[in-house]
Regions:
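Outer-membrane beta-barrel translocator/receptor signature
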Residues: 112, 125, 134-137, 143, ...
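Solvent-exposed loop segments that connect transmembrane elements
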Residues: 216-222, 260-276, 321-328, 371-404, ...
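Gram-negative outer-membrane beta-barrel transporters
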Residues: 356, 426-430, 579-591, 608-707, ...
Length: 776
C-alpha cells in the first residue's frame, strides 16, 4: 500500500511538472465553468421500463459512458466492478466463472443473484455473463433488489449494458491492442455503422482476442491461463414510421482457453505456487444471443416488446484435485437454449403519475453431461478404505472407477408487474411497485457409479486364492420438480432538496433467488455409500436402492429459494454548480435461506449449494465524480463498507460433528472497497497532435474470507494503474499499465479435503500494453 501511495504522488507530481512546462497547454480559466452532466442527459438509450432518470429514482446506481470506460482502461465487466461501490466480480478460473456480488449478496453456482441485460435482452445463463462486451455506449449498475421491474435473480442488483445505436452513430471504428511482457496479448476489433436512410441503419462488428497467459503449469510446461476468442455482431434498426421501431441484434462468440490456474497455497508463508496438474484444465464455449425489440410510440405512452433466443454450448475439463497425482477429474458439457418475451406499457409524458406495467415469460432448456473420473490416487485410497473394513483374508481393488451423470433441468418463469412514480408535490415523489412471479424448475437425472472390482479371497486349506471380478454398479434415477410463487413489492420516497436536482430518498424492497438442484455432489454421495456398505458389499456388485433411498437423495441435492428484504436511505447531490456529483447510500439487508457454495462435505468432490438459515448485510456506499479546469481534469472516487454475517447457519465437519457458523462472515464478500482515478488533458496547438492525456487509478479491496469457517482470507490490498494517451487527428494511441506495484493477491481460494491442501488463483502481476483506436 505504501508503494502505491508513493507511486501515485510521483505520478501526480510528474503531471504537474509536465503541465508547467507545456507552453502550448491551455491556460486555466479562473472562471472555470466545468459541469458534470448526468449520463442520462448525454448518452440517451431506450428505456422500456423507466421514465425517470437514474439519479432521480430512490436507488443507488452507477452509470458509465464509452469515454468513462476508455479513461478507466476497462476491458471487461470484472474490471468495471472495481469502480462501483459494493460490487465485485472476481476474475478467476475461466470464462465459465462469472460470479457477481453486490452488497454481500451473490451466488457462485447455478443461478445468479445479479441480473445482466445486454441491449434489453435478459441473459438467462450465468455461464454467458463473463464474455467480451464491445462497441458499448453505456453501462448501468443498479444496486439493491430490482425485483419489481426485473424479477427473480436480481436481488443483489442489475447490470444493464447498451451498445452503440447505429441510428445515432455512424462511421468505422478500428481498435488494435498489444500487451507487452508477462501475459503477452493481442486484440483486434472492427465495427462499421451505416445509416443509408432516415428509416434504416445497421452495424456489423467483429473481434479477436488472444493472451499468452501469466501462470505456467510446472507439471505440463504450458501456460495455464492462455485464451483465444473471437466473435461477430450485427445490429439492424428499422423505422418504417415515425412511431414504430424494430431493433434486431445478434451476437456470436467463441472461446477456447486454458483455465483454472490454481496453485498450492502455503498459509504459513503466505506464498502460492504455480499450478501443477495431471492434465491441462480447459474450457470451450460457443454462444449466440439474438434479440428483437419492437417499440410503438403512442404519443403519451410507449409500448415495447422484447423477444430473445439464447444458445450456449460449453465444455469444461478440470483436474479437480489440482495436483500432479491423478485423483479426480470432471468433464462437464452443457447445452442451453432459452427463449424470453417481455411486453411493457409505460407512460412517457411529464405528468404527476408515471407508470409502467408489463408481463414477462421465459423458458430454458438445459442439458448437463458431467462424468466424473477417479484416477489411480483415488482408487488407492478406496482400496485402503475397503481393506480397513474387510477381513484379513479378503482383498478388494478398484479399477476404471467413474461416475457418469446426465442432468436435464428445464426452467420456466412467468411474471406480471407494475411500478408507479407519483409526484405528491413539486418536491416529493412516491415509488410503488409490485411483481408476481412464478418459477418452476425440473430435474430429470440419471447418475451411476461404475467400477471394475477385483476381490481376492485367501481361504485356509486351499492351494490358491479365489479371485472374483465384480462389475460394481450403483444407480440413482429420478424426476423431481420445484415450484415457487413470489410477491416482490417496492416502496420508495424521493424528496428533491433544491432546483439543481439534489435529493434524498428512502426505499424498502424485496428480492429473491430461485431454488434448484445440485449435480456435483453425487460423487461424494457414492463414496459415502461405499464406505457405509463395507463388508456388506453385494456379491454381484449391484447396489439396490429403495424408494426411501431415492427420496433421501432427491432431498439431499435440493436447495431452497433465497429471499431478501432491503432497507435503504441515501442522497444524490449536485455540488458546486454541478461541478461535483456525490452519491451516498446506507443499507441493511435481511437474508433468509442464503444460498452458500461450499465443497462437498466428506471428500470435497465438487461444489454444492447449501442454504444458511439467516444472515444479514449492512453497509455504506459513496461515490464522487467531478470535472475541473474547463473540463481538462476528470476525476472520481468510490468507497464502500459491507458487513455481511451469518445469524443462523449450522453444518457438519468430516467427523459428522455439528458446527455453528453464527456470527461468521459470509465468504467471498470484501469488507472494504475503494477506487480513486484522475485524468488530465493537455491541449496542444499542433497540426497532427491535438492533446495528451495523463491518467492514473488506484483500486483496492479486502478483507475477504474464502470459507464459512473464516479460517482463510485475503487481506486488504490495492493496485496502481496508469495510462498516457496521445490524440491525433482521427487516431488515439494509449499506453497503459496495470498493477504497476506488482501487488501479490488472490482472486479465489479453495480448500481441498481430498488432499488437505488449499489452492488459490493469483491476481495478474504487473503488465502493460498499448491500444490504438481509429474512427473514420
Amino acid at each position: 500500500m505504501k508503494k502505491i501511495v508513493i507511486s501515485s504522488l510521483c505520478l501526480l507530481s510528474a503531471t504537474m511538472v509536465f503541465a508547467e512546462n507545456m507552453k502550448e497547454a491551455s491556460i486555466v480559466n479562473a472562471n472555470d465553468t466545468s459541469r458534470v452532466i448526468d449520463l442520462d442527459e448525454v448518452v440517451v438509450v431506450a428505456q422500456p421500463k423507466e421514465g425517470v432518470r437514474l439519479r432521480q429514482q430512490p436507488m443507488s446506481s452507477s452509470a458509465f459512458g464509452m469515454q468513462d470506460m476508455q479513461t478507466l482502461q476497462v476491458k471487461s465487466l470484472g474490471q468495471l466492478a472495481d469502480y462501483v461501490p459494493s460490487f465485485v466480480m472476481p476474475q478467476y478460473g475461466s470464462r465459465l466463472t462469472s460470479s457477481m456480488y453486490i452488497r454481500g449478496i451473490g451466488s457462485r453456482l447455478n443461478n445468479s443473484s445479479v441480473g445482466l441485460y445486454y441491449d434489453h435482452i435478459p441473459l438467462m445463463s450465468k455461464s454467458a455473463f463473463n464474455t467480451h462486451f464491445y462497441q458499448l455506449d453505456r453501462v448501468d449498475v443498479l444496486r439493491g433488489p430490482q425485483g419489481t421491474l426485473y424479477g427473480g435473480n436480481s436481488e443483489g442488483g442489475i447490470v444493464r449494458i447498451y451498445s452503440k445505436n447505429p441510428m445515432n452513430y455512424q462511421g468505422t471504428d478500428v481498435s488494435l491492442g498489444l500487451g507487452m511482457g508477462l501475459g503477452y496479448g493481442r486484440k483486434a476489433e472492427v465495427a462499421h455503422y451505416h445509416r443509408p436512410s432516415d428509416k434504416l441503419a445497421f452495424m456489423v462488428a467483429g473481434f479477436y482476442n488472444s493472451e499468452d497467459g501469466f501462470f505456467n503449469n510446472t507439471n505440463l510446461n504450458e501456460k495455464n491461463d492462455k485464451i483465444d476468442e473471437a466473435g461477430a455482431k450485427v445490429r439492424l434498426m428499422w423505422k418504417p414510421t415515425a412511431k414504430l421501431t424494430f431493433d434486431l441484434t445478434s451476437d456470436y462468440q467463441y472461446t477456447i482457453q486454458n483455465g483454472f490456474p490454481y496453485g498450492a497455497y502455503d498459509a504459513d508463508k503466505d506464498e502460492t505456487a504455480d499450478p501443477s496438474t495431471t492434465f491441462m484444465n480447459t474450457y470451450r464455449r460457443q454462444m449466440v444471443n439474438t434479440g428483437l425489440t419492437v417499440s410503438y410510440d403512442l404519443n403519451s405512452y410507449l409500448l415495447t416488446s422484447t423477444t430473445s433466443h439464447q444458445y450456449l454450448w460449453d465444455r469444461m475439463k478440470m483436474d479437480q484435485d489440482y495436483v500432479p497425482t491423478d485423483y479426480l477429474s470432471l468433464q462437464q458439457t452443457q447445452k442451453m437454449n432459452a427463449v424470453t418475451e417481455e411486453i411493457v406499457f409505460r407512460s412517457k409524458n411529464a405528468s404527476r403519475w408515471q407508470h409502467a406495467t408489463g408481463i414477462f415469460g421465459s423458458y430454458q432448456w438445459l442439458h448437463i453431461d458431467a462424468p466424473v473420473g477417479f484416477g489411480q490416487g483415488m482408487t488407492d485410497m478406496l482400496d485402503a478404505m475397503m481393506q480397513r473394513v474387510l477381513p484379513a483374508t479378503h482383498q478388494m481393488t478398484f479399477a476404471n472407477f467413474r461416475v457418469p451423470g446426465d442432468f436435464r433441468t428445464p426452467q420456466m418463469n412467468a411474471a406480471v408487474f407494475h411500478e408507479s412514480n407519483l409526484h405528491l408535490s413539486d418536491r416529493l415523489m412516491a415509488t410503488l411497485g409490485l411483481r408476481f412471479e412464478h418459477h418452476q424448475i425440473k430435474n430429470d437425472y440419471l447418475t451411476t457409479a461404475l467400477a471394475d472390482i477385483t476381490m481376492t479371497m485367501t481361504i485356509p486349506g486351499r492351494p490358491a486364492p479365489t479371485v472374483m471380478n465384480i462389475p460394481y454398479e450403483s444407480k440413482f434415477e429420478s424426476s423431481v420438480k420445484k415450484t415457487s410463487n413470489q410477491l416482490l413489492p417496492k416502496f420508495g420516497l424521493t424528496y428533491r432538496l433544491c432546483e439543481d436536482g439534489s435529493n434524498i430518498y428512502a426505499v424498502v424492497s424485496k428480492g429473491y433467488l430461485a431454488g434448484g438442484y445440485n449435480f456435483q455432489g453425487f460423487s461424494d454421495i457414492f463414496q459415502m455409500e461405499m464406505r457405509s456398505l463395507g463388508a456388506n458389499f453385494p456379491r454381484d456388485g449391484k447396489v439396490q436402492h429403495t424408494a426411501d433411498d431415492q427420496a433421501q437423495k432427491d432431498q439431499q441435492i435440493s436447495y431452497d429459494a433465497e429471499t431478501t428484504w432491503n432497507y435503504e436511505a441515501g442522497t444524490h447531490l449536485n455540488l458546486f454548480d454541478h461541478k461535483v456529483k456525490a452519491d451516498v447510500a446506507f443499507f441493511y439487508t435481511q437474508i433468509r435461506n442464503q444460498q452458500i457454495s461450499r465443497m462437498s462435505a466428506d471428500y470435497g468432490f465438487g461444489r454444492v449449494i447449501d442454504n444458511a438459515g439467516k444472515s444479514y448485510s449492512c453497509g455504506v456506499e459513496a461515490a464522487l465524480r467531478g470535472q475541473a479546469f474547463d473540463n481538462h481534469l476528470m476525476w472520481g472516487a468510490t468507497y464502500s463498507f459491507t458487513h455481511a454475517k451469518f445469524k443462523e447457519y449450522d453444518d457438519y465437519d468430516n467427523a459428522r460433528n455439528l458446527i455453528s457458523y453464527k456470527d461468521n462472515y459470509v465468504p467471498f464478500i470484501p469488507q472494504h472497497q475503494f477506487s480513486v482515478n484522475g485524468d488530465y488533458r493537455f491541449d496542444v496547438e499542433d497540426d497532427i497532435l491535438s492533446s495528451i492525456t495523463l491518467g492514473f487509478n488506484v483500486k483496492g479491496q479486502g478483507k475477504t474470507y474464502w470459507e464459512a469457517n473464516n479460517d482463510m482470507y485475503q487481506k486488504f490490498y490495492a493496485t496502481l494503474g496508469a495510462h498516457m494517451m496521445f490524440k491525433l487527428n482521427k487516431v488515439e494511441v494509449d499506453f497503459w499499465g496495470r498493477n504497476l506495484t506488482n501487488t501479490n493477491y488472490h482472486t479465489f481460494l479453495v480448500n481441498s479435503q481430498m488432499t488437505n491442501q488449499s489452492f488459490a488463483h493469483q491476481g495478474n502481476p504487473l503488465h502493460a500494453g498499448v491500444d490504438l483506436r481509429m474512427h473514420f
